[in-house]
Each structure stands twice: as C-alpha cells, then as structure tokens.
Amino acid sequence: MTKGILGKKVGMTQIFTEAGELIPVTVVEAAPNVVLQVKTVETDGYNAVQVGFDDLRDVLSNKPAKGHVAKANTAPKRFIREFKNIEGLEVGAEITVDTFEAGDVVDVTGTSKGKGFQGVIKRHGQSRGPMAHGSRYHRRPGSMGPVAPNRVFKNKRLAGRMGGNRVTIQNLEIVQVVPEKNVILIKGNVPGAKKSLITIKSAVKAGK
C-alpha cells in the first residue's frame, strides 16, 4: 500500500549504529496530517487522498477554505497536497509518522534552494577558459553559433536564474522514526532549505 506524509525539513545531523557506523541523516518534522477529502473514480475520475499540514491562523483563511476543512473538523491548513492510490482513510483521519517504519524506502520531494542569477559555470558545471597568457575567454558561455545557424538554439545552456525548482530524490531509506516527537530521520540529504515543505511517499521504483 502507498504511504505518504507532509513535513518540514529541520536540518541534518548524524547517528551511529550499534556497529559504530556513522550515518548522515536529515531530520523531518511531520506533525499529524489531516485527511481533508477522499477522491474516487466515480466522483473525480481518479483515486486520491487530499491531506492538509500546518494549521493556518483563522485571520489568514477565507470562508471557502474554512468550509472545505469543516467536514474534517479541523483548522484551515497552510499546505494541501494529494497522494494517489492510498486506501482505507476517511475524511478527518490523521496520518502520523508511525505510518512509516525504519527500513522503508521512500521518494522525497521538495523545492531546491534558490541561488539567484548565476553564470554557466555554477549553473551548468561548464569549464572555464585559461586565466592568463593573453586569453580573453574566462567564464563566458562560449560559442552560440553566430554564423552558421544565425540564431541561438532553444535549450542552449546560458546564465540565468538557478534553483527554486521542484526536485524529487528517489529511493531514500528511513533510518529511524520517533513518534513522540513527530520526527522522521532519512538517510542522506533531501532538497530544500530549513523549514521548507517536504513530501515523503512510498518509492515508485523500490526493489527495481
């Protein structure tokens, strides 16, 4: 069965196994998610569960938002996302971190850190030119075909805005779950800055 939960990235730390092996982990705080809506093939054309995370202040929510969460008997939520192919949940039910177990393989989605306007070396990993001996080519993007094509091709790697993209890292392992603190420890790094929204769901390629 597919599992899914929303949380916030706290940061990174490290833990040790009983054998003394060091494991770098990312700490994700996932307070209980509330099921706001259950979508079915008959009514919506597909099966999905809509969940909400992080209570929103009453002043910041409008009447439609309050009406939407009224059936779940909960406060309006800051983040609302859908998980497909999750069964056995009803409106108002809570999804907690103990849904997952140590050893589960998951896909983690977040928004990468924004870096602003960057050049081709930082943005695309291109090599620079010689820095001396009369060279006038240092950190520029290189030839763009000004003569033969007489135009710049689409998808040419150029300088521009870097980061701030939706990124998914697949097949990460859950090292530990701490239900009393609503915390999940995931092996390795996950995309996003501290306090950013993180989506954790069962890996689609697990075992492949």
From Swiss-Prot:
One Gene Ontology BP term is: translation
Q: Does the keyword Ribonucleoprotein belong to this entry?
A: yes
Fetch the PANTHER family from UniProt.
50S RIBOSOMAL PROTEIN L3, LARGE RIBOSOMAL SUBUNIT PROTEIN UL3C
Gene3D superfamilies recorded for this chain?
3.30.160.810, Translation factors
Task: Check the record and name the PROSITE patterns matching this protein.
Answer: RIBOSOMAL_L3
Question: Which proteins does it associate with, and in what oligomeric form?
Answer: Part of the 50S ribosomal subunit. Forms a cluster with proteins L14 and L19.
Tell me which family the UniProt entry assigns to this protein: Belongs to the universal ribosomal protein uL3 family.
**SUPFAM superfamilies linked:** Translation proteins
User: Under what name is this protein listed?
Assistant: Large ribosomal subunit protein uL3
Q: What is the lineage of its organism?
A: Bacteria, Bacillati, Bacillota, Bacilli, Lactobacillales
* Gene Ontology CC, one term: cytosolic large ribosomal subunit
Stretches the record annotates as Disordered: 123-147
Pfam families reported for this sequence: Ribosomal_L3
GO terms (molecular function) for this protein are: rRNA binding; structural constituent of ribosome
InterPro entries linked to this entry: Ribosomal_uL3 (IPR000597), Ribosomal_uL3_bac/org-type (IPR019927), Ribosomal_uL3_CS (IPR019926), Transl_B-barrel_sf (IPR009000)
**Which organism encodes this protein?**
Streptococcus sanguinis (strain SK36)
**Keyword annotations of the record:** Ribonucleoprotein, Ribosomal protein, RNA-binding, rRNA-binding
Summarize the protein's role.
One of the primary rRNA binding proteins, it binds directly near the 3'-end of the 23S rRNA, where it nucleates assembly of the 50S subunit.
The answer to whether keyword Ribonucleoprotein applies is: yes
